[in-house]
Regions:
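N-terminal targeting signals for export/organelle localization
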Residues: 1-35, 165
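Short, ordered coil/turn segments that flank beta-strands lining enzyme active or ligand-binding pockets
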Residues: 37, 47, 137
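Short active-site neighborhood of thiol/selenol oxidoreductases, capturing the structured segment around
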Residues: 43-62
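Alpha/beta-hydrolase fold active-site loops
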Residues: 51-52, 83, 130
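Structural microenvironment flanking redox-active thiols in thiol-disulfide oxidoreductases
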Residues: 65-105, 115-121
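Thiol/disulfide oxidoreductase modules built on the thioredoxin-like
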Residues: 100-108, 115-160
Length: 165
């Protein structure tokens, strides 16, 4: 009897895991307004027509700081093909720290500050950093990473999305 329960538990876990994998289709990126460091604004609607990496991060997050050179390199590699990056600093990150980080690292992409936390809330109540979303040309989230992405896998997915009409 224990063996049957054990096998049933494994089968159920695989079914649930497979279901999560299969049902992880693209969902529309939430309507948001991003306030960039220069004071200009960008909306979720502005992301359509290009593949965009939306990275929630903080200057106090060791992993965020460590992955930023790879995020910048990914941006540089694909930007001429319709790829964009938007780094969204968390509400608890002092704006002066974010500006200093972006300027001293010469980040080659847009950086926004989520002063109120509304953007993080809209994107699935992001609390852990880094949390990164890959958005396709139709404005749909196709992948979510919590923690540093596997950049080889991310590049393969970007290539695939850039090839789509």
């Amino acid at each position: 009897m224990k063996k049957v329960l054990y096998v049933a538990a494994i089968a159920a876990a695989l079914a649930v895991g497979g279901g999560v994998y299969l049902s992880s289709g693209a969902t529309a990126a939430p309507a948001s307004t991003f306030v960039l460091l220069d004071g200009s604004k960008k909306s979720t609607e502005d992301l359509k027509g290009q593949v965009t990496l939306v990275n929630f991060w903080a200057t106090s997050c060791v992993t965020c700081v460590a992955e930023m050179p790879q995020i910048a390199a990914t941006h540089e590699k694909y930007k001429s093909r319709g790829y964009n990056t938007l780094a969204v600093a968390m509400s608890y990150d002092p704006p002066s720290y974010v500006v200093n980080f972006a300027e001293t690292r010469k980040l080659p992409f847009s950086v926004a500050i989520d002063n109120t936390g509304a953007v993080a809330q809209a994107w699935g109540d992001v609390k852990l950093t880094p949390t990164t979303y890959l958005v396709n040309k139709r404005g749909e989230i196709v992948k979510r990473y919590v923690g540093e992405p596997d950049f080889a896998e991310l590049h393969r997915l970007i290539e695939k999305l850039l090839a789509q009409a």
